């Protein structure tokens, strides 16, 4: 049997604990719409949102600058301070684990909640930051055009 090594989407040799602004996207497993609609989050969506809002209290100096919980994914701008002792993989991994644990407490038998890994982009300058901030801000309005939106009139994912 042949086993393949999955290529890491991270930049080789980059220190992901370094002081920077990061644009993060985390998708649900198979892009299932678990989190409700953008304007009315489900119970699972509320859990995902609450955990995002608590990140800064779990990690000293880390902050979530802008975020949106969408039906099947989450976008955020995560700011890591200088002298930070956690790397991005630890933070995102623990976030995903915490949300999964809470969801399984509500609905036992729930298997995978999240897609493997996550997407990241290192924000390079003010223009990059502004474009990403606007993208996150506009994401709920653009949901009705998404191929995973079942009802373009209401934006419902269910």
Predicted regions located by residue number:
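Short catalytic/metal-binding and nucleic-acid-binding patches
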Residues: 1-158
């Amino acid at each position: 049997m042949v086993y393949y090594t999955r290529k890491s989407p991270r930049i080789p040799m980059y220190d992901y604990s370094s002081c920077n602004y990061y644009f993060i996207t985390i998708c649900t497993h198979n892009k299932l719409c678990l989190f409700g609609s953008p304007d009315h989050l489900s119970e699972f969506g509320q859990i995902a949102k609450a955990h995002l809002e608590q990140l800064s209290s779990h990690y000293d100096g880390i902050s979530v600058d802008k975020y949106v919980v969408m039906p099947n994914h989450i976008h955020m701008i995560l700011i890591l301070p200088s002298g930070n002792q956690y790397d991005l993989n630890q933070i995102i991994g623990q976030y995903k684990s915490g949300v999964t644990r809470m969801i399984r407490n509500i609905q036992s038998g729930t298997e995978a909640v999240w897609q493997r890994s996550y997407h990241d982009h290192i924000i390079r300058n003010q223009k990059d930051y502004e474009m990403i901030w606007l993208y996150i801000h506009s994401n709920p309005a653009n949901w009705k055009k998404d191929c995973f939106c079942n009802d373009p009139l209401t934006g419902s994912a269910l």
